[in-house]
């Protein structure tokens, strides 16, 4: 399986992101972000996403700098319990690391330590907004 990689750039114009969400059929996104998102323009984008596009947003920020494995496990649980179909990371390295691991572990057996399992590719879309 080869993942499709798309690079979007812009300064506060998120129309390409809207188009991408439409193209992949997102209905509910897991937004992995730290507290600093509230100071960023993109916060307004996600606050209005459901109203504008009908895409629900579930925020996950239950992790610390230099996140622990247990934080990722919590994130995978939130992804499964809420039925999110897309993972979005906004912020710095910790948000990116946690979100990438949530995507990576999302289709693994949650009764066994993820680090002891074979990595199995999955089709869950992943979007990174550094």
Task: Name each model feature, range by range.
Residues 1-86:
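ATP/NTP phosphate-donor binding region
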């Amino acid at each position: 399986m080869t993942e499709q990689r798309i690079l979007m750039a812009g300064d506060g114009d998120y129309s390409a992101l809207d188009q991408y969400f439409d193209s992949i059929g997102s209905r509910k996104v897991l937004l992995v972000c730290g507290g600093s998102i509230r100071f960023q323009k993109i916060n307004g984008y996600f606050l209005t996403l459901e109203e504008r596009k009908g895409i629900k947003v579930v925020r996950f920020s239950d992790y610390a700098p230099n996140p622990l494995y247990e934080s990722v496990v919590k994130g995978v649980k939130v992804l499964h319990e809420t039925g999110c179909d897309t993972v979005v990371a906004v912020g710095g390295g910790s948000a990116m690391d946690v979100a990438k691991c949530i995507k990576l572990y999302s289709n693994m057996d949650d009764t066994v330590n993820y680090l002891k399992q074979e990595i199995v590719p999955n089709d869950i879309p992943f979007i990174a907004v550094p």
